Amino acid sequence: MKHLWFFLLLVAAPRWVLSQVQLQESGPGLVKPSETLSLTCTVSGYSISSGYYWGWIRQPPGKGLEWIGSIYHSGSTYYNPSLKSRVTISVDTSKNQFSLKLSSVTAADTAVYYCAR
């Protein structure tokens, strides 16, 4: 029984640790057409440099979630093909933050933006 208990703790620990992770978006609430939207996500409770992909998603009014892109702590990026030409995601491990820049915004970019892991 001791072995089973240890195994359960070992499996459960990573989930417990990750449950303490908090992400907080910051940036302007409004951006004018043709301007660049800049958002920053500050991570607490976990070091970005320890791994995992970090990303941005958005939800236009009355629609579902749309993946914008993701970044690994090393700087490797992956973007939604439909937004790739306008999106830049970067990471600053020294500040434990990652950022989104979306250029040439239009009314079609109206959405609630979220950072995620």
UniProtKB/Swiss-Prot annotation:
Annotated segments matching region Complementarity-determining-2: 71-77
Pfam families: V-set
UniProt keyword list: Adaptive immunity, Cell membrane, Disulfide bond, Immunity, Immunoglobulin, Immunoglobulin domain, Membrane, Secreted, Signal
Species assigned in the record: Homo sapiens
Positions of disulphide bridges: C41-C115
Protein name: Immunoglobulin heavy variable 4-38-2
Region (Framework-2) location: 54-70
Domain of life, source organism: Eukaryota
Residue ranges of the region described as Complementarity-determining-1: 45-53
Stretches for region Framework-3: 78-115
GO CC list: extracellular region; immunoglobulin complex; plasma membrane
Taxonomy of the source species: Eukaryota, Metazoa, Chordata, Craniata, Vertebrata
Span list, region Framework-1: 20-44
Quaternary structure and partners: Immunoglobulins are composed of two identical heavy chains and two identical light chains; disulfide-linked.
Alphabetized InterPro entries for the sequence: Ig-like_dom, Ig-like_dom_sf, Ig-like_fold, Ig_V-set, IgHV
Signal peptide: 1-19
Major subcellular site: secreted
Subcellular location: Secreted; Cell membrane
